[in-house]
Amino acid sequence: MASASVGDDVLGDDPTVIELQNRLARMLDKQAALFVPSGTMSNTVAIKAQTRHGDEIVAHKKSHIYLYESGGYAALAGCSISLVEGPWGQMSAEGVQNAIRKSEGSDSHYPDCNLVCVENTANVGGGTIYDQQTLDEICEVSRLNDCRVHLDGARMFNAAVGSGTDPARMVRDFDTVSVCLSKGLGAPVGSVLVGDYETISESHRWRKMLGGGMRQSGILAAAGLYAMENNIERLSEDHSRARRLAESISEMTNFSVDLGSVQSNMVYVDCLEVGAKEMRDRLAKRGIDVLDETDSVIRAVVHLHITESDVDRAIGAFEASQYSASVQ
């Protein structure tokens, strides 16, 4: 990062940012890409660039766009949202079809749905991975209804590695894709939005308006390039460790884990007997950090800094914490 070649990305002449954008665009077989500070901004500018004020978008009821982006689709893009239910945080083509509303034929009672948003992997679903056939069917249904399709691919490389699918094939039918560099890939900051020239050009305008234009951002893009070159293949190690952690916790008396949902690097643990906040605090005393997702469910995430011995330590901490808050 310290030795990165830099320019001014607001003016479009930072060579390291350009290299990162071009690499992602080529890898995903899209025309162009845009480096942004965060995944939330990437999703926001993608929605804004592909909708009009008063339109509607479709997303899963447990999607990051709906739950964890401060309602940006409404406040910033002026869109309502039609929510789809489905197991493990995933939508079906039928669910998407039923959620799409159009103004035409409704005596102008309905808004126009012009964008369908899919999340892969599905975070709150447990880090689950969509079948490629389902992705293809959702894109087809969207096209038949004159809707564009956006992939919130914050962890799409986890999905690609976990399913053995070529990344470009996975996103072939999506108009835009948001890729996060700072999750499983391990870069300190940044996401990249990829798509066609026109949409990325419009997204560039909204990035500027939202304060996402950065000057010598090549120092950040350099970390993203390193992550792309070195940290994709190794994601399978995180998946394997998450699976071992999940299987061990599932055998403990006071915890419940849906092993079917453990498909990437996340483990959602139901600790109803203790409560999520209490369990979070008990584990923290033993040096294990987790998030409390609901009153009873915590989330543990395995990343590139977690070793096999760390997993062993986490298993021991869960075992001890299910009965007592004290640290021996």
Where are these regions (language model features)?
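Conserved PLP-enzyme active-site core in the AAT-like
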Residues: 1-4, 8-273, 277-286, 290-306, ...
